[in-house]
Amino acid sequence: MNEKTHRVLEFDKILDKLKGLTASELGRELVLELTPQTDYRVVEKMLSETNDGVSCIMRRGSPPLGGITDIRMSLKRLDMGGVLNPGELLRLAGVLRAARRLKGYINDKLDENNASVVKELISCLESNQRLEQKIDNCILSEDEIADNASPALSSIRRQIKEQQASIKDKLNSIIRSTKYQKYIQESVVTMRGDRYVIPVKQEHKGDIPGLVHDSSASGATLFIEPMAVVEANNSIKQLRVKEQTEIDRILAELSQDASLVLPQLNANMSIMARLDFIFAKSKLAIDYNCICPKINDTGKIIIKKGRHPLLDPKIVVPIDFWIGEKFSSLIVTGPNTGGKTVSLKTVGLFTLMMQSGLLVPANDGTEMSVFEKIYADIGDEQSIEQSLSTFSSHMKNIVDILSGVNNKSLILLDELGAGTDPTEGAALAMSILECLHQMGATTLATTHYSELKVYAISTTGVENASCEFDVETLRPTYRLLIGVPGKSNAFAISKRLGLTDDIIERSKEFLSQEDIRFEDILLSIEKNRSEAEKEKMRAESYRQEAERLKKDLEDQKRRLAAQKESELRKAREEARRILTDSKRQADELVSEMKRLAKEQEEAEVRRQTEELRQKLNKSINNLDDSLVESIMPRQGLVKPPKNLKPGDTVLIVNLNQKGTVLTLPDKNGEAQVQAGIMKINVHISNLKLVDEQKQQIQRTGMGKIGVSKAQNMSTEIDLRGMMLSEAVDVVDKYLDDASIAGMGGVTLIHGKGTGALRAGLHQHLKHNPHIKSFRLGKLGEGENGVTVVELK
């Protein structure tokens, strides 16, 4: 592909736009090297990387390309062992920063499973934040090294500042001194040759001892360094030398650190240049609303709503174009400024862009072919608006084309055969087209010659096309109509402009019958095409309406299905909820029934216990009645307690058992008394307050009952082999009897074993009202195998 083809198709202007979208000189260099490729696989890869860049920008926004500078010369110096200056090191740090930011641009969570050219390139970048930060911390600008770049540099600069302050103090004291003030030209401290001086009047140079470093333009002022600060200025100069030495050492150290990662830096430069180039192509595609076309190498081109990228997008008319299936040569006819050349250039420029890895401004469904050669004869330096070139210029270009054309070539010929005798020009044009067609080239030509229309109609593999012209408005519509030959429209245009019918009819008489018939055929074809297009548009409208109705019905069907599914889901959820509630209610009912059964069982137990208690009380009362006769003679000696009240501790005389008064005596003289675990009704005559017991104890004979009970009971009980529940019942009965018998203490034998019985008994004994305390047995008593209980 030659430079002339690029120029006439204005591909260089596309490259200029692309160059303006790069972020670095490295990217611009790659743009300048960009040329259309002829290898199908290479083109496919280039398009893929551009399309991938578009996807990245659409998902993540513009990439962080700032800081990509050309440091290749600095890297060469490092490779040769050189030391970089502060500016070079800052630019190197900027490149490292750019690499780090680019690595952060790709977020694996967004497309961790997707292969990506951009992602692969970025993953190959090497960041070195340690070196980047070290350079940034040490170097403030191209002319300034930070004080904290090293401890030595910080110390040197501190000493310099101290010396400078000391010198200024001394010089200011001289300036302010009444002794020297009259010799001073101006009360300022200034510098000459990096040394602090003061301005002294010329006539008093001998009055202030020192070194003269400079004088004013008039000679009236001498800049003198007083001897008092000469040594301090010398010290500063020496410190400056040390400062520069330390700075050189710091720069050498940073350069050495950078040289250790030289291979990574060189690789980063190449990768970032490539990324800048890819993203520039992607930005161009986004700016022009481009798509990635499907590609082939068979010569087939299908362009859907293609827009020439160099025309104003507000006025450009999209074209629909196809070639390479039923025909490989297309002849476009029609009036000038009708859009023929624009169509020609659009096809050619799209092909160059696609084969350079650039996306094309068209709609989805566009397909482009990869050609080995692209030739264009559109006149020297011709732009879209320029006039045609001369016949000789055309022929020279065509000769060059014919010498190199093959079946993988795209040929673009504008106004083929123009600039000479129409008859000869038409004959030459047909011969050239026939030659190109026989060679298998894909050819697109524009012409004014009617003979070429006939050639296209009569030749297999060749097709007519035209650019539509609106006779009513006398303006072209710029629409490309493939399959329809163009008309000159001279008579129609003339009539619209006011030419009389007589002249127009007379002019038609000069035409041959063949021309008239041909024009009539074209008119008929155009009329039929127009009607067919209207019918097509109407059919398309009906189709779209049918599609819309179909879509509406499908949407309605989906909505109904979704609604049905939703209702079923709600019904299932409601049924599930009802089942859950029913199960919960059933569980609650079962629990309630169990609770009621338990309460009923407990009530039955309480009833039986109460019956037993009543039987016991009846037995006790019977016992009281049977003993009345033997007791009464002795009771007569006992006085009933006076002012008896609930809570008083009394002795039940006939039982010799202590108790607590619960109620006041009733009309029968009986009070309810708590004796151990039993509540019994006792006549007040059978009660005695405890504090009166000692005075009256000898007068009663009831002690015989307790003594008799104690004589019949054992002081210990063996519980070994019993279950805890069984042992608890036995112990309660035993302790009741022991308490009634007035025993002071008893021993429970439970054995050692696992200790479970002992632990359970101890827990139960804590709540027994008869017990004062309890403990495990001591040595000789049975130790852990027994529990000794002290009763109240």
Curated annotation (Swiss-Prot):
CDD domains reported for this sequence: ABC_MutS2, ATP-synt_Fo_b
UniProt keyword annotation of Transferase present: no
Gene Ontology BP annotations: mismatch repair; negative regulation of DNA recombination; rescue of stalled ribosome
Binding of ATP, residues: 334-341
Broad enzyme group: hydrolase
A GO term, aspect molecular function: ATP hydrolysis activity
UniProt xrefs under Pfam families: MSSS (PF20297), MutS_V (PF00488), Smr (PF01713)
UniProt EC number: 3.1.-.-, 3.6.4.-
UniProt keyword rRNA-binding, yes or no: yes
Smr domain mapped to chain residues: 717-792
Source organism superkingdom: Bacteria
PROSITE patterns (UniProt xref): DNA_MISMATCH_REPAIR_2, SMR
Family, similarity comment: Belongs to the DNA mismatch repair MutS family. MutS2 subfamily.
HAMAP family: MutS2 (MF_00092)
Function according to Swiss-Prot or TrEMBL: Endonuclease that is involved in the suppression of homologous recombination and thus may have a key role in the control of bacterial genetic diversity. Acts as a ribosome collision sensor, splitting the ribosome into its 2 subunits. Detects stalled/collided 70S ribosomes which it binds and splits by an ATP-hydrolysis driven conformational change. Acts upstream of the ribosome quality control system (RQC), a ribosome-associated complex that mediates the extraction of incompletely synthesized nascent chains from stalled ribosomes and their subsequent degradation. Probably generates substrates for RQC.
NCBIfam families in the cross-refs: mutS2 (TIGR01069)
Quaternary structure and interacting proteins, as annotated: Homodimer. Binds to stalled ribosomes, contacting rRNA.
Protein name as it appears in the record: Endonuclease MutS2
Organism of this sequence: Ruminiclostridium cellulolyticum (strain ATCC 35319 / DSM 5812 / JCM 6584 / H10) (Clostridium cellulolyticum)
Organism ancestry: Bacteria, Bacillati, Bacillota, Clostridia, Eubacteriales
Gene this chain is encoded by: mutS2
